[in-house]
A protein has these predicted regions:
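Single, function-defining residue in the core of a domain
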Residues: 1-12, 21-24, 31, 50, ...
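Active-site-proximal, Lys/Arg-enriched surface segment
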Residues: 4-5, 32-112, 223-225
Length: 390
């Protein structure tokens, strides 16, 4: 808990800054050494953080939300001695660099504009037991779905248009929305055509907005297709002409009947940007790529704790007026589209004047023999350290 709190109060994943922000009345080196030892030798920290995050955030997920799942990357090209480092594609520059794959799932409420991070996992193709990226994606989806009561729509970019993934989704009856990658033939009207061939021939009978609240409308069409491997399992394709060179082609397992449902699917796909923005927030807001640790366990634990810290901010995004006020960054009174940078700045400002945070009870326990108090529940739905802020 204290490491997560240190991440929030320091705004970084650097262990020296985390230790400094905890303000323990002992040498900084001792605090940093204790945190470093805990992160390096206890690989169960990442699993525990994931479970806590899912237990707190999963009950907030409803049928109307979307779950954006997106493979990302952690660039470690400047740290060649990092343990189990592999080769990944840098999403910012497009280069192949040394680093680790990231996998994140974010719940997005399209109507209210709220974002809830569910899980972020650091992976490595060089780790023991690695099978494939497809297996990693399915494992994360299964872990998240295990904590959910609802069956929301999973949204993934064109990297998810893979035969093994479609096989698992269809056989497990998942609600998914995937952007077609134009690398396969679909069964369509007694023919076999690629996604772009269908897009050129399909009449676009409907009109709707690309994003919720926009007035400008674009033409789109809806048709039924199937995979060659599963000809009896219908899928629905939505083709959108939005001014770019190639039409946007979306395929879903969820039935699409009429203009309104088609428009809602378009909104759902374009709102998956929240997952990409989440990666950017983890890298910039918490300075993930500036971490100097080399052990894979340490990096894995820090990524999981950063995701937990983001989830804690998310639990206050609708009632975090005091945190936003502390940030003093918003020139407009309108609610920010992605409020977590401001919430993080407000959190740092809120505790910047504190002398000590967690240490006093340790001193009382040593002198009086008292037992340690239970750790406070920092999430907004339970009375805890920040419950009075609500």
């Amino acid at each position: 808990m204290e490491t997560t709190f240190g991440i929030l109060t320091s705004g970084t994943l650097k262990q020296s800054e985390i230790a400094r922000s905890l303000k323990e009345p002992c040498r900084l080196h001792h605090t940093q050494k204790r945190i470093s030892r805990m992160l390096a030798k206890h690989d169960e920290v990442s699993w525990t953080a994931e479970q806590l995050q899912l237990q707190q955030i999963a009950p907030l997920v409803t049928e109307d939300m979307i779950l954006a799942i997106d493979p990302g990357d952690l660039n470690r090209d400047g740290a060649p001695k990092s343990e189990l480092r592999g080769r990944v594609r840098d999403g910012d520059k497009g280069d192949i660099v040394g680093g680790y794959p990231l996998l994140s799932v974010v719940a997005r409420d399209v109507k209210r504009g709220s974002t809830f991070p569910l899980i972020t996992r650091l992976l490595s193709p060089n780790r023991a037991g690695y099978r494939s990226e497809n297996r990693d994606i399915l494992t994360v989806m299964e872990e998240v779905q295990r904590h959910l009561k609802a069956k929301p729509l999973w949204v993934i970019d064109r990297g998810g248009d893979r035969g093994n993934l479609w096989k698992a989704w269809i056989e497990n009856d998942r609600n998914v929305l995937v952007r077609a990658a134009n690398q396969r033939y679909w069964l369509w009207r007694n023919t076999q055509k690629t996604a772009q061939q269908i897009a050129r021939e399909l009449p676009l009978k409907h009109r709707g907005s690309l994003r919720r609240g926009q007035e400008k409308e674009v033409p789109f069409g809806i048709t039924r297709v199937a995979l060659r491997e599963y000809p009896d399992r219908p899928l629905w394709m939505v083709v959108v002409r939005h001014g770019k060179r190639e039409p946007l082609v979306l395929v879903t397992t969820r039935p699409v009947r009429g203009r309104r449902q088609g428009e809602r699917l378009i909104h759902s796909y374009l709102d998956r940007w929240a997952c990409e923005e989440g990666y950017r927030f983890t890298k910039q807001g918490f300075d993930l790529e500036g971490v100097q640790a080399r052990r894979f366990t340490t990096l894995q634990n820090l990524v999981a704790l950063a995701s937990l810290a983001w989830a804690l901010l998310a639990s206050y995004q609708e009632e975090g007026g005091k945190l936003l006020e502390k940030a003093r960054r918003q020139k407009s009174r309108k609610s920010p589209t992605f409020p977590f940078y401001s919430l993080l700045a407000g959190w740092q400002h809120l505790f910047s004047a504190a002398r000590v945070i967690f240490h006093p009870w340790l001193r009382r326990r040593r002198h009086s023999g008292a037992t340690a108090p239970p750790p406070p529940d920092l999430f907004a739905d339970a009375p805890g350290l920040l419950g009075a802020m609500r």
